[in-house]
Amino acid sequence: MNPLTLIIIMFTLFMGTMITVFSSHWLTMWIGLEMNMLAIIPILINKATPRSTEAATKYFLTQATASMILMMAITLNILDSGQWTLINPQNQLTPVLITLALIIKLGMAPFHFWVPEVTQGVPLKSGLILLTWQKLAPLSILYQISPSINPTMMMSVAILSIMVGGWGGLNQTQLRKILAYSSIAHMGWMAAIITFNPNTMVLNLIIYILMTIPMFMMFMQHSSTTTLSLSQMWNKNPLMVSTILITLMSLGGLPPLTGFIPKWIIIQELTKNGNIILPTAMAMLALLNLYFYMRLIYSSSLTMFPTTNNLKMKWQFESTKRMPLITPLIILSTMLLPLTPALSVLN
């Protein structure tokens, strides 16, 4: 892609998200979402292969459907209230439709089917943008309308997303699909807390992004996309593989790593609100995610795949890519737990 074209597309993507995040008007919010959707399509098909084209088409059709539902909900809100601002909707159907549209855009269960397929079909850089930056705009709208969201609907979506995120990743050998199912599970945790404490949802989102970015950066550093390539990397760069495995444990929410913070705070917040069974079920289902991360760790480090002479010589072809931000991001993604007492301001 032409560098100037790429700059324009990335600027449009950035502006679309910022317009949505900082807007309190439904029309500008919708325009920002559409700018965001149209700008990401060329990024997804940056390498024009049949697979990336198919992934971009799936993404476009899904997002267009969600945008149509959202526009219908906005129209109903205008007919009922006569205003374009984000106020408590008078019609009970309006917040349900808005929530439904945003759930589709975020790829939460039961509308999650496009997330693993699209993530698998695009390059690692595009997958990183898809699973991190593209979550900001829809979640900002959910944050603003959180007082009018149906808690029962969101808790059902949350439990289902955590379950799907755990079960879906069990049989996967593709690293991008594993991270896609991890994203679905993390979206479930955010959905569970948004009606009770939206600020905790923001904290969860920040920590999720801090953990996902270094994972993708480490995969990009060595062009690893499968568990086989990850295990073969052990011969070439054992320190990097060890870091990847620790970050995977953090993504799974294993204490005392960073990923344990949001789960701990969310379970505490739900318990304070009188929910005992739901956080218990969420914690049990989260073990599925931790299980397939631990299995990936076992297959990558404790068992060694057969190595050939060509593989042993890979040290001569070290990657020349340099990512200076990767070290502080790795530290943040694994060692943030000592800062947790300072997060008591959220309570």
Curated annotation (Swiss-Prot):
It catalyses: a ubiquinone + NADH + 5 H(+)(in) = a ubiquinol + NAD(+) + 4 H(+)(out). Its EC number is 7.1.1.2. One of its GO terms (molecular function) is NADH dehydrogenase (ubiquinone) activity. Keywords: Electron transport, Membrane, Mitochondrion, Mitochondrion inner membrane, NAD, Respiratory chain, Translocase, Transmembrane, Transmembrane helix, Transport, Ubiquinone. InterPro entries: Complex_I_Subunit_2 (IPR050175), NADH_DH_su2_C (IPR010933), NADH_UbQ_OxRdtase_chain2 (IPR003917), ND/Mrp_TM (IPR001750). The chain crosses the membrane at residues 3-23, 59-79, 95-115, 127-147, 149-169, 178-198, 200-220, 241-261, 274-294, 325-345. Pfam families: NADH_dehy_S2_C, Proton_antipo_M. GO terms for biological process: mitochondrial electron transport, NADH to ubiquinone; mitochondrial respiratory chain complex I assembly; reactive oxygen species metabolic process. One of its GO terms (cellular component) is respiratory chain complex I. It is a multi-pass membrane protein. Belongs to the complex I subunit 2 family. Core subunit of the mitochondrial membrane respiratory chain NADH dehydrogenase (Complex I) which catalyzes electron transfer from NADH through the respiratory chain, using ubiquinone as an electron acceptor. Essential for the catalytic activity and assembly of complex I. Core subunit of respiratory chain NADH dehydrogenase (Complex I) which is composed of 45 different subunits. Interacts with TMEM242. This is NADH-ubiquinone oxidoreductase chain 2. The lineage of its organism: Eukaryota, Metazoa, Chordata, Craniata, Vertebrata.
